[in-house]
């Protein structure tokens, strides 16, 4: 009898060429977007010397992403998904070229940066939604947990590498190099994506796009299982906004500039460990209960984080949060894909991703408000323990999610 390993199995990259193409394209895309993410705030700060105008660019791009996720969900359920992915990526690349040309002007336009940020945020979201909706067809629903864990590792690795490369480019060549390489990387991602098979949506009656989107909302609200998963995801994303308190807590712990970096690295490190040790998650008989408990544990870790007497213990709490939130997120992703009808995958994935965007923004705003009334320690603890109380209530209320059972997939020799 073969025993399933705790470690993540990377065999999907060998056995599924289409997923391998997506993996490669996603990694290049994350690095490209990381170059952009470093360049835009630096350029606006250099042009205006205003942190408010820097924040405005983030807000505008986030708003465009939200709209793009809504529209992308409808398009992914209505049109051939490969075409939507390719169109979105190519259109994003055009926007990056625009940013590069604008940066080369003697006097770059701030308005152009904002407008191109709206452009890129919108079209990037279209591709994300279509790709999520297409994933079950690329790997099979029985491999979704494994695919999600590999994707999480890709995102974490790319998110670590790209800011470092972006910073070096800024120091040596200026923002135009960042934009130019981001555009080049985006167009390069089209090469592996062209090898994907056709990904048609399931046949369904034609209806007005708004009516189609409302149908997705109704399904989300009417399904205790899928709706509960989305709600937990939003709360978990709110908890991750604790990073806005890092500078203030660093002062409280009297941390040096070098030590502050450990706070920012702790959650990604914990999440990477969670993804690497997710080998048995797909074989859990009660994934809903495990999701609820791991979410509660992550809230407790945030509540304890601010109370730690030493910063190193705070880092341990953040790493624990990263690990538990990775477990919860992987279970959310897998259950959402398996419990959503094929005809609804685009819209539900769009709504699920959108709540991640809004949950982070709401969490940051709430923590900012708490920070104005409380000490940083009290703000962090209040947010964590407040979410823990809500989580306990959801553990009692979300009966269908708590009691959900699945038949674990059969373990083969290749899985060991």
Curated annotation (Swiss-Prot):
Cytoplasmic topological intervals: 1-21, 77-83, 131-156, 200-218, 278-287, 337-356, 400-416
Localization per record: Cell inner membrane
An annotated Gene Ontology molecular function: enterobactin transmembrane transporter activity
Keywords in alphabetical order: Cell inner membrane, Cell membrane, Membrane, Transmembrane, Transmembrane helix, Transport
TM regions (residue ranges): 22-42, 56-76, 84-104, 110-130, 157-177, 179-199, 219-239, 257-277, 288-307, 314-336, 357-377, 379-399
Family matches, as InterPro entries: Enterobactin_exp_EntS (IPR023722), MFS_dom (IPR020846), MFS_trans_sf (IPR036259), TM_effector (IPR010290)
Gene Ontology CC entries for this record: plasma membrane
Topology term for the membrane: Multi-pass membrane protein
Statement: the UniProt record of this protein carries the keyword Ribosomal protein: no
Membrane topology (Periplasmic): 43-55, 105-109, 178, 240-256, 308-313, 378
Pfam families given in the database record: MFS_3
Top-level taxon of origin: Bacteria
NCBIfam families assigned: PRK10489.1
Family affiliation: Belongs to the major facilitator superfamily. EntS (TC 2.A.1.38) family.
Function (record text): Component of an export pathway for enterobactin.
Name the record gives this protein: Enterobactin exporter EntS
């Amino acid at each position: 009898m073969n025993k399933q390993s705790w470690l993540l199995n990377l065999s999907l990259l060998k056995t599924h060429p289409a997923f391998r193409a997506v993996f490669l394209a996603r990694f290049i895309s994350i690095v490209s977007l990381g170059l952009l993410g470093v360049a835009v705030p630096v350029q606006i700060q250099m042009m205006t010397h205003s942190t408010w105008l820097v924040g405005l660019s983030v807000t505008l791009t986030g708003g465009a992403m939200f709209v793009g996720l809504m529209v992308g969900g409808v398009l992914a359920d209505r049109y051939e998904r490969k075409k939507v992915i390719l169109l979105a990526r190519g259109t994003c690349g055009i926007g990056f070229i625009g940013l590069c040309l604008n940066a080369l002007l003697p006097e770059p336009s701030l308005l152009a940066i904002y407008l191109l940020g709206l452009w890129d945020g919108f079209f990037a979201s279209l591709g994300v939604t279509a790709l999520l909706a297409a994933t079950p067809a690329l790997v099979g629903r029985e491999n979704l947990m494994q695919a999600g864990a590999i994707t999480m590792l890709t995102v974490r690795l790319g998110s670590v590498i790209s800011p470092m490369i972006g910073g070096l480019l800024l120091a040596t060549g200026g923002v135009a190099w960042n934009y130019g390489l981001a555009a080049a990387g985006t167009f390069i991602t089209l090469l592996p994506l062209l090898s994907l098979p056709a990904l048609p949506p399931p046949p369904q009656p034609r209806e007005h796009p708004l009516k189609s989107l409302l149908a997705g909302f109704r399904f989300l609200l009417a399904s205790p299982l899928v709706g509960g998963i989305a709600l937990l995801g939003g709360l978990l994303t709110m908890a991750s906004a604790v990073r806005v308190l890092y500078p203030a807590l660093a002062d409280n712990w009297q941390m040096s500039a070098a030590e502050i970096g450990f706070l920012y690295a702790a959650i990604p490190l914990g999440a990477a460990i969670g993804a690497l040790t997710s080998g048995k998650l797909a074989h859990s008989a009660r994934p809903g209960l495990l999701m609820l408990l791991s979410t509660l544990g992550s809230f407790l870790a945030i509540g304890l984080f601010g109370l730690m007497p030493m910063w190193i213990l705070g880092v341990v709490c953040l790493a624990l949060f990263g690990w538990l939130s990775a477990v919860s997120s992987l279970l959310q992703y897998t259950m959402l894909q398996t419990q959503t009808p094929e005809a609804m995958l685009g819209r539900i994935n769009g709504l699920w991703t959108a709540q991640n965007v809004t949950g982070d923004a709401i969490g940051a705003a709430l923590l900012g408000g708490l920070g104005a009334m409380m000490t940083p320690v009290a703000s962090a603890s209040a947010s964590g323990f407040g979410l823990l109380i809500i989580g306990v209530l959801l553990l009692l209320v979300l009966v269908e999610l708590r009691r959900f059972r699945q038949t674990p997939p059969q373990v083969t020799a290749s899985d060991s």
